[in-house]
Design a protein with these regions (language model features):
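Gly/Pro/Ser/Thr-rich low-complexity, intrinsically disordered segments predominantly at protein N-termini
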Residues: 1-258
Length: 258
């Protein structure tokens, strides 16, 4: 981590701090820390996670959001910026309405935070884990593309601190809170571009649209065939009625002659 200044800031000063454009800062016990520029794989993993969580929340009609570049206050004068934050929609709307930096305060607790390891990986495994545990964040993921593993920290019932489970390549990582949210470790550690996923979904939607159009055309053809058959049946019935009427008339004529 890179300390910006030896002069300490309060949490309120941090909220209104105007640093270098494009640079993200954390606050650790009053010290301003410049976060390292993320690598390409770091960005891809974060974008992939946000995309998957948003799809999951939409599919299950959950009032939750997945956001990035959102800070979480962990101590009196400390604030961390997880790579991904999961919180309720109402909470996010409240934070969005506040002036200054987007920061979740003590009473604004996220449901899940995710860190993708980088140069300061020790902070993710030790210091940040302790801070997130201290403020009772229910679930904390550490995605480590260098060691090729994912650590999911959570607090089991009747336990006072985090325990964790690690997921390795070839396995599937599962959220503790969202049991149906399951991802391949291999895919998460080396994810596709979100743009490619969107293109695939668009292609699938177009294919489904074409299939629906074909089914609609087939239904229209069947309806036309049914109408033609109905017309033929009606014509045959009318023909039979005319024939029966003619036979009755002929029978009446014969009775008269006799």
């Amino acid at each position: 981590m890179t300390l910006i200044s030896t002069q300490k800031l309060t949490f309120e000063e941090y909220l209104n701090y105007q640093g270098e454009s494009g640079v993200c800062y954390e606050l650790y016990r009053g010290h301003l820390i410049e976060m390292p520029t993320p690598t390409a794989i770091h960005i891809k993993i974060c974008e992939f996670l946000v995309y998957q969580f948003r799809r999951f929340f939409a599919a299950h009609n959950l009032p939750l959001v997945a956001v990035v570049t959102t800070a979480v206050r962990t101590e009196e004068n400390s604030s961390r910026v997880p790579d991904v934050v999961i919180c309720t929609r109402n909470l996010w709307e409240q934070v969005s309405a506040n002036p200054g930096s987007a920061v979740l305060d003590f009473e604004e607790k996220p449901l899940l935070v995710i860190e993708v390891t980088s140069q300061n990986w020790r902070d993710d495994y030790i210091r940040k884990r302790a801070e997130y545990d201290l403020i009772d964040i229910p679930e904390y993921w550490i995605v480590d593309p260098n060691l090729l593993k994912i650590r999911v920290c959570s607090r089991p019932e009747n336990e006072g601190s985090y325990s964790h489970q690690e997921f390795l390549p070839g396995q599937q990582v599962q959220s503790v809170q969202f049991a149906e949210f399951i991802l391949s470790v291999n895919t998460l550690l080396s994810p596709p571009l979100v743009e490619d996923l969107i293109r695939e979904e668009e292609a699938q939607l177009q294919q489904l649209g074409q299939q629906n159009q074909q089914l609609e055309q087939q239904n229209q053809q069947l309806e036309q065939q049914n109408q033609q058959l109905e017309q033929q049946v009606n014509a045959e019935r009318q023909r039979a009625e005319r024939l029966a009427q003619r036979l009755r008339e002929m029978g009446g004529d014969m009775d008269t002659e006799l």
